[in-house]
Amino acid sequence: MALVVQKYGGSSVADAERIRRVAERIVETKKAGNDVVVVVSAMGDTTDDLLDLARQVSPAPPPREMDMLLTAGERISNALVAMAIESLGAQARSFTGSQAGVITTGTHGNAKIIDVTPGRLRDALDEGQIVLVAGFQGVSQDSKDVTTLGRGGSDTTAVAVAAALDADVCEIYTDVDGIFTADPRIVPNARHLDTVSFEEMLEMAACGAKVLMLRCVEYARRYNVPIHVRSSYSDKPGTIVKGSIEDIPMEDAILTGVAHDRSEAKVTVVGLPDVPGYAAKVFRAVAEADVNIDMVLQNISKIEDGKTDITFTCARDNGPRAVEKLSALKSEIGFSQVLYDDHIGKVSLIGAGMRSHPGVTATFCEALAEAGINIDLISTSEIRISVLIKDTELDKAVSALHEAFGLGGDDEAVVYAGTGR
């Protein structure tokens, strides 16, 4: 008997019909002789609707109350799926994140999981119940308040619960048949991938691939939890995320795919003194604003000798906060101005094969040049090349790179609904 954790996203439980379909799949898994734990997201656009409501009643909703509000979405879908399972003759019991033992930091809106104490879940499993856990939420270790986990929180909940229960696999159900060499909405002949290493999936998630979120993959790699990405709408085998690139023979390594990200912004600090310590002041200020930095470029400044310009990218949602923090410290740090651009996009090529295939960077840049796309900034790792370009050219760039590296398959990928989550 295997212990299977399944996670269903908002599009998979968007209405009553889809909830019943999900319940049937869950019961089938139970009847196959497995213990089953299910993590669900809020139905469809429920979270966005709740956010809109909050902003209608308050220009600045208190973070604690916002978390109390938003967690209602997952509790609703959790209970509805449990009801649907019971109607099929199986036994189900639903738990909120706090009831399931998901212990977090106290940062409302973006809490991190500290621990999972799954005693109540184990008891329910021992009684033969199908266990349901509301995703995206937990309880603060210090204040005991309800917290939310931020973007990708339900995926992270599923992997954390799987690790705590020592599950055999964590199945993440989306609206595509696994992981592809590119977004099928942009590249219809994107090729399905049977397996992907944790490192490759981390790079893909960090570069904008929306099927799995970065925090979820980080957690899975840390606790060696295999992730099985499948579609809620088909019985196709999906993609297994497991193992390390070190386990892949060098000659067998391939290029995994092309990822893109429309959600970044570019910040440029102009006229910074070109002496030791000033770059550190810039990045310390950004860190104090709780903004994560992605790509970084430093150039000789054109405005004055002895000065430098530093450009970095961050999440678009956090860009204004970084600019505000830096602007407040302009005189103290000693730069001329801050420039902000949120009309950018990032496109990346990922794959363990880069380690053994010379010329990848040249082909990458040539493909973009032939498509008439100008590169603003380049960043690389052992298994990734990323460039910053205009956001209006992202789709063209993805298609050009996918074709240049021969990543396409013979069949057209199917997207069943929603946004790939």
Swiss-Prot record:
Residues 267-348, 349-421 form the ACT domain. It catalyses: L-aspartate + ATP = 4-phospho-L-aspartate + ADP. Its EC number is 2.7.2.4. InterPro entries: AceGlu_kinase-like_sf (IPR036393), ACT-like_dom_sf (IPR045865), ACT_Aspartokinase (IPR054352), ACT_dom (IPR002912), AKii-LysC-BS (IPR041740), Asp/Glu/Uridylate_kinase (IPR001048), Asp_kin_monofn (IPR005260), Asp_kinase (IPR001341). It is an enzyme of class 2 (transferase). Keywords: Amino-acid biosynthesis, ATP-binding, Diaminopimelate biosynthesis, Kinase, Lysine biosynthesis, Nucleotide-binding, Repeat, Transferase. GO terms for biological process: diaminopimelate biosynthetic process; homoserine biosynthetic process; lysine biosynthetic process via diaminopimelate; threonine biosynthetic process. Feedback inhibition by lysine and threonine. PROSITE patterns: ACT, ASPARTOKINASE. GO terms for molecular function: aspartate kinase activity; ATP binding. Substrate binds at residues 25-30, 45-49, 74, 125-126, 151-154, 274-279, 292-294, 298, 360-361, 374-375, 381-382. ATP binds at residues 7-10, 41, 174-175, 180-185, 210. CDD domains: AAK_AKii-LysC-BS (cd04261), ACT_AK-LysC-DapG-like_2 (cd04923), ACT_AKii-LysC-BS-like_1 (cd04913). Pathway: Amino-acid biosynthesis; L-lysine biosynthesis via DAP pathway; (S)-tetrahydrodipicolinate from L-aspartate: step 1/4; Amino-acid biosynthesis; L-methionine biosynthesis via de novo pathway; L-homoserine from L-aspartate: step 1/3; Amino-acid biosynthesis; L-threonine biosynthesis; L-threonine from L-aspartate: step 1/5. The record marks 7, 74 as: Contribution to the catalysis. SUPFAM superfamilies: ACT-like (SSF55021), Carbamate kinase-like (SSF53633). The keyword ATP-binding applies. It holds the Pfam family ACT_9. GO terms for cellular component: cytosol. Belongs to the aspartokinase family. Heterotetramer consisting of 2 isoforms Alpha (catalytic and regulation) and of a homodimer of 2 isoforms Beta (regulation). Catalyzes the phosphorylation of the beta-carboxyl group of aspartic acid with ATP to yield 4-phospho-L-aspartate, which is involved in the branched biosynthetic pathway leading to the biosynthesis of amino acids lysine, threonine, isoleucine and methionine. This is Aspartokinase. It comes from Mycolicibacterium smegmatis (Mycobacterium smegmatis). The lineage of its organism: Bacteria, Bacillati, Actinomycetota, Actinomycetes, Mycobacteriales.
